[in-house]
């Protein structure tokens, strides 16, 4: 499926009052909605930069449904739900009834009947979360934890929170470079959408033509393409390195990993071309010596581990807001409490 065809109308994600009830994609959401997610996430981090625990989802059940392998995303969603005092169930998809021929629809209906309040879904098929929210379980809050090459909205929002907290600059004043496998990366797609919605006017995509998607110009007027790394990172405030998505590539996009590192690897010489206070980010997992040098990943400008902490806060925000949006939609509460 061409990604341009995966349009998610805002009314699927928002309730009648305009509040989040599902979180499926960045595209179609307003700056106000994204800012509310960021502000709510920030409220879950105290003055000592520690995550708080709150009873906002006490008595609610969050089910993690990961049809693709994950370490960080699944674990941080579990940590986020527990900090909201929710019950968390991690469904073993490999041993579920879907492996015995049961349809996805029937599996989800059975899980919904077990009093699930929120499904956190990762799936290899683009549009899976949209399908579940629209056609299967509209009264369960659906959080997209990554669907194929399409979207990874919570990763984008934790990246936006990291950028906001670390640079302390308005998005309108930032130059952001995204380096690597843009073609196969749902993170790149979601980050570009979030940056544009929040007002960033200088988004630089640095990649060989073989790692750029068809219809790249559809990403917007504020996105510029650079095939040469040195030109792209010059005077940047933020650099986001992406790994090559080998599991989604049918044929090799480059001759070797060594060739990619030579042309697009982030090393000390290239980082020196950016602004002195430039921050370095990576969604993980990292391939050291391919897209990023260890001296950069572990260096003073790296905020990679901060992204992980911010990820828990953002996922707390999305879980809380979408649950309350669902309750508001069903007339069970009048106003959002966070």
Curated annotation (Swiss-Prot):
Record keywords, A-Z: Pyrimidine biosynthesis, Transferase
Annotated GO MF terms: amino acid binding; aspartate carbamoyltransferase activity
The gene coding this protein: pyrB
Enzyme class: transferase
Chain's role: Catalyzes the condensation of carbamoyl phosphate and aspartate to form carbamoyl aspartate and inorganic phosphate, the committed step in the de novo pyrimidine nucleotide biosynthesis pathway.
Oligomer and partners: Heterododecamer (2C3:3R2) of six catalytic PyrB chains organized as two trimers (C3), and six regulatory PyrI chains organized as three dimers (R2).
Gene3D superfamilies: Aspartate/ornithine carbamoyltransferase
GO cellular component, one term: cytosol
Disulfide bonds: none
Record-stated family: Belongs to the aspartate/ornithine carbamoyltransferase superfamily. ATCase family.
Residues bound to carbamoyl phosphate: 72-73, 122, 152, 155, 284-285
InterPro entries linked: Asp/Orn_carbamoyltranf_P-bd (IPR006132), Asp/Orn_carbamoylTrfase (IPR006130), Asp/Orn_carbamoylTrfase_sf (IPR036901), Asp_carbamoyltransf (IPR002082), Asp_carbamoyltransf_Asp/Orn-bd (IPR006131)
Pathway, per record: Pyrimidine metabolism; UMP biosynthesis via de novo pathway; (S)-dihydroorotate from bicarbonate: step 2/3
Residue numbers binding L-aspartate: 100, 186, 243
Protein name: Aspartate carbamoyltransferase catalytic subunit
């Amino acid at each position: 499926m061409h990604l341009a065809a995966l349009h998610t109308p805002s009314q699927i994600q928002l309730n009648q009052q305009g509040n989040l009830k599902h979180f499926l994609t960045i595209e179609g959401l307003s700056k106000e909605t994204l800012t509310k997610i960021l502000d709510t996430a920030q409220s879950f981090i105290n003055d000592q930069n520690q995550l708080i625990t709150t009873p906002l989802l006490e008595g609610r059940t969050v089910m993690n449904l990961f049809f693709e392998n994950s370490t960080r995303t699944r674990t941080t969603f579990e940590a986020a739900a527990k900090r909201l005092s929710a019950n968390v169930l991690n469904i073993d998809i490999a041993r579920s009834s879907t492996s015995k021929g049961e349809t996805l629809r029937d599996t989800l209906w059975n899980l919904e009947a077990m009093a699930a309040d929120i499904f956190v879904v990762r799936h290899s098929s683009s549009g899976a979360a949209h399908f579940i929210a629209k056609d299967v379980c509209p009264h369960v809050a659906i959080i997209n934890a990554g669907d194929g090459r399409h979207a990874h909205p919570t990763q984008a929002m934790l990246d936006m929170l990291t950028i906001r907290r670390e640079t302390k600059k308005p998005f309108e004043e930032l130059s952001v470079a995204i380096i690597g496998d843009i073609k196969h990366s749902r993170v790149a797609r979601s980050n570009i959408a979030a940056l544009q919605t929040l007002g960033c006017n200088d988004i630089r995509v640095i990649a060989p033509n073989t790692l750029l998607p068809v219809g790249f110009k559809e990403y917007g007027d504020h996105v510029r393409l650079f095939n040469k790394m040195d030109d792209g990172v010059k005077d940047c405030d933020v650099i986001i390195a992406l790994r090559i998505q080998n599991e989604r590539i049918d044929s090799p996009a480059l001759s070797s990993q060594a060739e990619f590192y030579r042309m697009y690897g982030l090393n000390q010489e290239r980082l020196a071309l950016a602004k002195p206070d430039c921050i370095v980010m990576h969604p993980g997992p990292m391939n050291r010596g391919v897209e990023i040098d260890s001296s950069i990943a572990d260096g003073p400008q790296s905020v990679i581990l901060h992204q992980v902490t911010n990820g828990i806060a953002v996922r707390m925000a999305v879980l809380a807001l979408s649950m309350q949006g669902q309750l508001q939609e069903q007339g069970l509460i009048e106003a959002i409490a966070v």
